[in-house]
Amino acid sequence: MNKLIPLPREFFARDTNLVSTELIGKVLYFQGTTAIITETESYIGNDDPACHAARGRTKRTDVMFGPAGFSYVYLIYGMYHCLNFVTEDEGFPAATLIRGVYVISHNDLYTIYTAKVKSQITDEKTQSIIISEDRRSTKFDIPNLEESNLYLNGPGKLCKYLGINTTHNKCDLINNKDFFVSDIGLNLPYSTTKRIGITKGTDKLWRYIVTDNKNALLNINIL
């Protein structure tokens, strides 16, 4: 693999919408998996009703008030994790939500996923049934790992298959060899839309997604 270099903290310590747009086409590297970021959303400060920090500084949102370039990972509905990158100046709570990635290389995501499911169950017969049924599920569109490229659309799906959870909260993305963002010079076309999956602040055009992702991402190879 070509050597990937983490982005500097200065990249994240800027206007959140600028960071969100410029993250499109950047590489997310996480513990052996390399993926192109394809969809982001901005959550900005106390005046954004959809931003967790709108309710003030809490133990959960403390990382958002800290230095830029750290991960903010939280659990929603008791089952889905979401990955964010802290942005702006320290003291101003803001972050970019990573909503989608296109996997270029991986360390067998399906093996990782099934191992996690099996760890919750002791009966071997039940294990095999659950794994079999879940792989056929359309809810998460479980990918065929015989294909080298995988499109993970949705923050919960992204975290599930990459293995990102709350233990990866508050990770420094600048000084971390296993979890960082890199620039390989990709300039992908993207569209701007209203944010989705929220009930407040729905009028803000703070969602950015690669346009015609199938063609834009086809044949990308950084190995």
Swiss-Prot record:
BP-aspect Gene Ontology terms: base-excision repair
Is rRNA-binding a UniProt keyword of this protein? no
Q: List the disulfide bonds.
A: none
* UniProt family annotation: Belongs to the DNA glycosylase MPG family.
InterPro entries in the record: Formyl_transferase-like_C_sf, MPG, MPG_sf
Ordered alphabetically, the record's keywords are: DNA damage, DNA repair, Hydrolase
Catalytic class of the enzyme? hydrolase
Q: Which organism is it from?
A: Rickettsia typhi (strain ATCC VR-144 / Wilmington)
Q: Which SUPFAM superfamilies match?
A: FMT C-terminal domain-like
> Which GO molecular function terms does the record list?
alkylbase DNA N-glycosylase activity; DNA binding
Write down what this protein is called. Answer: Putative 3-methyladenine DNA glycosylase
- One Pfam family name from the record? Pur_DNA_glyco
Known EC number:
3.2.2.-
